[in-house]
């Protein structure tokens, strides 16, 4: 079994780089929001969109909560109780952290590739928006959504939190309708450029040929 302090560090490392990128992103976003006008907005199906949002919120609760509780276990002798108890087998922890890191790295690379063009879903598209096709976007069209699923699956295995399969199912339920709604706007905005991008790059899975 992986020591709990090591497990907490493994959860914290990608979070640190994510926080740095998020601060930079929101700083740029708030500056540009005042001088840029949004145009098209996706017509989301609310039940599917809210299912996806619920899944993402659960992801953050499990990620931050698991990391914090594992760290608090270091003070068991002081508190007299354990904050979190995980009995995952070593193979489950290792495979879980591999899947978790695949998702976390994809998440970080997506933020880096998209930069200021990554928009909160309801905000719409800026007039000066460009189609990002680098990094993870060169492999699949919606890498951020896929990263959510990988992170949740990884956490469920690494921390033995099998209830996370419920929010994972919610995200899987909401991904396709939400992505389709966004792509309708992107096709309208970018025309043939996005149509060609769709032919070349898979939506949620890489195109092998």
Predicted regions and their residues:
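Membrane-anchoring alpha-helices and their flanking helix-loop junctions
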Residues: 1-130, 152-209
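Active-site-proximal inter-transmembrane loops
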Residues: 121-145
